[in-house]
From Swiss-Prot:
Residues 1-22 form the signal peptide. Residues 47-79 form a propeptide. Pfam families: Antimicrobial12. Keywords: Amidation, Antibiotic, Antimicrobial, Secreted, Signal. It comes from the Eukaryota. The modification Glycine amide is found at G44. It is found in: Secreted. InterPro entries: Antimicrobial12 (IPR012515). Residues 48-67 are annotated as: Disordered. This is Dicentracin. Its main location: secreted.
């Protein structure tokens, strides 16, 4: 859906520019800028999700270590 919208918008921009305006380098730079912005949005979201996943895994490991230590203390108290 995003790609279709992007394609239609960029097509409109290209079709609206007249060849006599010598405007193509501006269009090309705009397309490159939009592409980079989309790339940042896509990879930025992935990086944030990876960071959240890593934090979740660390929290799980900490919780398991705490439970293991608590179990060992209780076991030592009964011995």
């Amino acid at each position: 859906m995003k790609c279709a919208t992007l394609f239609l918008v960029l097509s409109m921009v290209v079709l609206m520019a007249e060849p006599g305006d010598a405007f193509f380098h501006h269009i090309f730079r705009g397309i490159v800028h939009v592409g980079k912005s989309i790339h940042k949005l896509v990879t930025g979201g992935k990086a944030q999700q990876d960071q959240q996943d890593q934090q979740y895994q660390q929290d799980q490991q900490d919780q398991q270590a705490e439970q293991y230590q608590r179990f060992n203390r209780e076991r030592a108290a009964f011995d």
